[in-house]
Amino acid sequence: MPVKIKVSGFTILVAALAFFSHAAVPLGHIFFILALHESGHAFWAWFFHYPIRQLSILPFGLALTLEHFGDGDAWEELVILAGGLAMHGVIPLLYGGLAKLGGVSPVMLDWVLDINRSVFLFNVLPLYPLDGGRIVQSLWHCFLPYRTAQALTIGLSALGTPLAFVKLMNCNPMTLGVFGFLFAVNLISWRQRAYQAEHFYLYRLIHPCSHPLKLHRKQDLYRQRYNVILEPGGLLGEKQWLTRRFGKAGPLSSQPRSWLI
């Protein structure tokens, strides 16, 4: 499947302003850092056969749109998320080599490394939907039922976003806008928890797993287990539980999920 590349109109406006204000070179370095970060996600998504539907170029970064991200194997998704963060370790090596060859000045080297460090530290914040928040989400999904993991991820992130803004960042309009966006995403995700769970259940009905068995009484599924649910009438396997919930399901239409960098 070919990957669509989408550039927002606001991105074009920002690029034009940067060009005419002689800020194109710094903006180019920032874009390269973000593109390298995203390439780490893209490589591991391709490696684990997650279809990449779209690459969006936004004013504040890039975003991959992956089909069924959040429904598949949580350990694979941890690798996909860590792959993007690991690319920040390449920047010091690459720019350090360029500096030794005279390709960039010492001042530019220090500036690029500072930007690279800031982007990395921002992304590892345990706030959904940043990489750090999604890593926390995947870890919850390794050990907890789906609905519980989602509630903990989004609830703690919604509480932590204002605290991170107050404690870690300067109160300028751009920072306020970024953290306001993160908080809004958390509120929307909280309201969509039931839909997300139903989508996950339907995905599991169409794509049965081969994980180790988990016997429990919850009317929910552990994402990293094949679930056997103990009910008053006896044991109910995961497939039977899902079939009772949905009936016979046809092909599942793709509902892509994305993360923003």
Where are these regions (language model features)?
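Helix-coil boundary and interhelical linker segments in multi-pass alpha-helical membrane proteins
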Residues: 20-26, 96-114, 166-174
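Small-residue-rich helix-interface/hinge motifs
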Residues: 19-77, 111-115, 119
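Multi-pass membrane catalytic core of lipid/isoprenoid biosynthesis enzymes
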Residues: 59-94, 147-170
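C-terminal transmembrane module of polytopic alpha-helical membrane proteins
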Residues: 143, 148-261
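Metalloprotease/metallohydrolase-associated module, dominated by Zn2+-dependent proteases
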Residues: 1, 74-125, 134, 183
